[in-house]
């Protein structure tokens, strides 16, 4: 599936939030906390539609999903039982790249996406190289043996020791495995880390 490859800091400044979780975006928002462009400082009053659009774009860029894929997630969430917004959150949080990010094996979602694409992880003993793969409750994700000593993964695990793993994940840093327990905790809006 495709991904966004355009200017990241510009998008973060437009939205007013560092959606790509990089240091460059933090610094740019600190130095220039206004939208990019010639008329960026002259901010017009935001309408309700503008606020809703900005929040949708924030979620879309955070999870690395393009517009059509996001629309498909929304359609699927509206068909499911329950509140559509919560269902959408569950669908986005249960993506394989997001589960790896939430488990603390990657420092950002784009990094998790790349690690999945390069086949560094197994899902229930089989290689999966699709970042948007939906992880179900009870699935076990493990780092393949040849990738266990990758500097990127090791550094993220070492530096993220104080990171609180969500309760819907069971992480074993010694075996380098993750098991999804249940997504019911997500209904209570438990998101510990953007």
Model-derived regions: residue spans:
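Ordered, amphipathic secondary-structure segments that act as subunit-interaction surfaces
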Residues: 68-99
């Amino acid at each position: 599936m495709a991904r966004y490859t355009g200017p990241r800091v510009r998008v973060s400044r437009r939205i007013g939030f560092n959606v790509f979780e990089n240091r460059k975006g933090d610094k740019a928002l600190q130095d220039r906390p206004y939208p990019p462009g010639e008329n960026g400082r002259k901010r017009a009053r935001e309408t309700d539609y503008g606020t809703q659009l900005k929040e949708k774009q924030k979620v879309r860029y955070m999870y690395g999903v393009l517009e059509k894929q996001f629309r498909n997630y929304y359609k699927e969430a509206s068909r499911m039982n329950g509140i559509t917004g919560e269902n959408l959150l569950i669908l986005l949080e249960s993506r394989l790249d997001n589960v790896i990010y939430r488990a603390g094996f990657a420092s950002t979602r784009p990094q998790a996406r790349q690690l999945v694409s390069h086949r560094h992880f197994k899902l229930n003993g089989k290689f999966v190289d699709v970042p948007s793969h939906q992880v179900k409750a009870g699935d076990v994700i493990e780092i393949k043996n040849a990738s266990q000593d990758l500097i990127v993964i090791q550094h993220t695990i070492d530096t993220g020791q104080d990171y609180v793993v969500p309760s819907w994940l069971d992480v074993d840093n010694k075996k380098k495995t993750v098991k999804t327990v249940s997504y019911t905790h997500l209904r209570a809006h438990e998101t510990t880390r953007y």
